[in-house]
């Protein structure tokens, strides 16, 4: 969590340094005529199954200008949260994205703190934020409690709440529970929130909800039939949700 970027060699370090100076020093002056949008194939970027993990980096690169490389910060620390700078229509933007390939994209104490730092950095330099969301919630567990998930997680809400730069959120597959608020929700002052047509915005996923809502029914069902009934009820829940 200390080092932002590890370069391959001296030449790479100089190149990245120059690129970052260009991103940070834009100060509102940009040339849209030089912007080149990525080729976005939505069907290829996300898996068909909503439960299958995927790497969010190709999606980020497709959304940003192809002639300005995405410069990721702290890629080895809290990898379930991807943060970095790029350009969108020629304008420098800060990108935050859940990465389902790591911990399913869950928020935890470290990823929340990483994201909060980045939000404050972008706000200080007047850089707009693009938040790409696919999150099942906060990572549960005793380790997270001992790691200060409440204290460190609150930093992300505070960072978004006090940010004055434009902030746009895109929900790709799902956003559940408390993570809905934390990931730049309208409640925290998001400029705009968009969602793909099949995105889920809910308290919890269908399978978890069925386990609570139909607990007695499932308990009374023979064990050999319980899983099939659970799947059937979950499918019905998804259909009417």
Region spans (language model):
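Ligand-binding clefts of soluble mixed alpha/beta catalytic domains
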Residues: 1-240
